[in-house]
Swiss-Prot record:
GO terms for biological process: translation. CDD domains: KOW_RPL26. It comes from Nitrosomonas europaea (strain ATCC 19718 / CIP 103999 / KCTC 2705 / NBRC 14298). This is Large ribosomal subunit protein uL24. The lineage of its organism: Bacteria, Pseudomonadati, Pseudomonadota, Betaproteobacteria, Nitrosomonadales. GO terms for cellular component: ribonucleoprotein complex; ribosome.
C-alpha cells in the first residue's frame, strides 16, 4: 500500500513551487508524481497538420519526486505524515500520524 495515492491532496515541501497545495493527477513511475498546476514548464510544440496540432508554446506539468511532496491534513491545515493500521474488519487503512484521523474513510 502506498502512502500517497492518485487523488490525494498534497503540498509541495521543496523546489520552486514550495508551499503550493494541489491534488495528485497520476504517477509517472514509482518515485515521480504529476501534481495539478504545479511544476509547470513551457514546451515548444512543432505544428503537425496531419494530427491537427497547431504549433506554439504550451505549458505542461512535469513530474515531481515523491520526496518533495507531503500529504495535506485539512484539519490541521498543514503537511502531515502517513501511518498504516488495521481497522475492525481487518483491512489496512491509512491515517494521519499527528491526530490519528483516517485518510481512507
Amino acid at each position: 500500500m502506498k502512502k500517497i495515492r492518485k487523488g490525494d491532496s498534497v503540498i509541495v515541501i521543496a523546489g520552486k513551487d514550495k508551499g503550493k497545495q494541489s491534488t495528485v493527477i497520476r504517477f509517472q513511475s514509482t518515485e515521480r508524481v504529476i501534481v495539478r498546476e504545479v511544476n509547470k514548464v513551457k514546451s515548444h510544440i512543432k505544428p503537425n497538420p496531419n494530427r491537427n496540432i497547431a504549433g506554439g508554446i504550451v505549458e505542461t506539468e512535469k513530474p515531481l519526486h515523491i520526496s518533495n511532496i507531503a500529504i495535506f491534513n485539512p484539519e490541521k491545515n498543514k503537511a502531515d505524515r502517513v501511518g498504516f493500521r488495521f481497522n475492525e474488519s481487518g483491512n489496512k487503512v491509512r491515517y494521519f500520524k499527528s491526530d490519528g484521523t483516517l485518510i481512507d474513510s
